[in-house]
C-alpha cells in the first residue's frame, strides 16, 4: 500500500508560505491545502460555512477547529502540503491523529521566518495589489498577535518531535525555495 506524504508550512501571515507551498506542490505533484483560500472561497460563494466564518475572519480571529478539521478531512489527498494549518496545538494533535488514521507520513514542518515589520509591509502591499479587504494595518497586527499567541507554541511541539525545519524567509522567492528543498532533503 502506498503511504501518503505530508508537508506542513508554518510561519506568520506574510512570510511567503503560500507562494512556496504552491511551488513545491506544483513541482513535486502534491495537493496544496490552504485553509485560508478554502475559507475565502466559501465566504465569496456565500455558502453556509462561508456565512458562519465571515465575521470570525473579519475580526482576524481563528476559525474554530471543528470547522477546519471538517474541511481538511474532505480535502485530504495522498500527497498533501498544508499551508496555514495547523494553527493551534489542538489542531496539530488532531492532524497527527488524522495523518495516522490515513497512513500519511509527515515529511517535515517548514517554519518560514521573517521579521515582523517586513511581514506588515508585505501584507499591506499584497492587500493593495489584490484588493483583499481583510488586510488593513489593524487587522494585520491583530493577525500577527493571534499567530504569536496561538501558533508559535507549535514550533516547540514540532521541534520536540524532531520534524521542524527552520527556513529564512528573506531574499528572493527562488532563494527561499532552495532553502526549503534543502531543509526537507527533496
From Swiss-Prot:
Family note: Belongs to the adenylate kinase family.
PANTHER family in the record: NUCLEOTIDE KINASE
Localization: Cytoplasm
Protein name: Adenylate kinase
EC number, as in UniProt: 2.7.4.3
Spans annotated as LID: 125-135
Tree of life domain: Bacteria
Biological role stated in the UniProt entry: Catalyzes the reversible transfer of the terminal phosphate group between ATP and AMP. Plays an important role in cellular energy homeostasis and in adenine nucleotide metabolism.
InterPro entries assigned to the protein according to its UniProt record, in alphabetical order: Adenylat/UMP-CMP_kin, Adenylat_kinase_CS, P-loop_NTPase
Pathway assigned to this chain's UniProt record: Purine metabolism; AMP biosynthesis via salvage pathway; AMP from ADP: step 1/1
Residue positions binding AMP: 35, 40, 61-63, 84-87, 91, 132, 143
Quaternary structure annotation from Swiss-Prot or TrEMBL: Monomer.
Cellular compartments per GO CC: cytoplasm
Statement: the UniProt record of this protein carries the keyword Nucleotide-binding: yes
Entry's free-text remark on domains: Consists of three domains, a large central CORE domain and two small peripheral domains, NMPbind and LID, which undergo movements during catalysis. The LID domain closes over the site of phosphoryl transfer upon ATP binding. Assembling and dissambling the active center during each catalytic cycle provides an effective means to prevent ATP hydrolysis.
This protein's encoding gene: adk
Biological process according to GO: AMP salvage
Region of interest called NMP, as start-end residue ranges on this chain: 34-63
Amino acid at each position: 500500500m502506498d503511504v501518503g506524504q505530508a508537508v506542513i508550512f508554518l510561519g506568520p501571515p506574510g512570510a511567503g508560505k503560500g507562494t512556496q507551498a504552491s511551488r513545491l506542490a506544483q513541482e513535486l505533484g502534491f495537493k496544496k491545502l490552504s485553509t485560508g483560500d478554502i475559507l475565502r472561497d466559501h465566504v465569496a460563494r456565500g455558502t453556509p460555512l462561508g456565512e458562519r466564518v465571515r465575521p470570525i475572519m473579519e475580526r482576524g480571529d481563528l476559525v474554530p477547529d471543528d470547522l477546519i478539521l471538517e474541511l481538511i478531512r474532505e480535502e485530504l489527498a495522498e500527497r498533501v502540503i498544508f499551508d496555514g494549518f495547523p494553527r493551534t496545538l489542538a489542531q496539530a494533535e488532531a492532524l497527527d491523529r488524522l495523518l495516522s488514521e490515513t497512513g500519511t507520513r509527515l515529511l517535515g514542518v517548514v517554519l518560514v521566518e521573517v521579521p515582523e515589520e517586513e511581514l506588515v509591509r508585505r501584507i499591506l502591499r499584497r492587500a493593495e495589489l489584490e484588493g483583499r479587504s481583510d488586510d488593513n494595518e489593524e487587522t494585520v497586527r491583530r493577525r500577527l498577535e493571534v499567530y504569536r499567541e496561538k501558533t508559535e507554541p507549535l514550533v516547540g511541539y514540532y521541534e520536540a518531535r524532531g520534524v521542524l525545519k527552520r527556513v529564512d524567509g528573506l531574499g528572493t522567492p527562488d532563494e527561499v525555495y532552495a532553502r526549503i528543498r534543502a531543509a526537507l532533503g527533496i
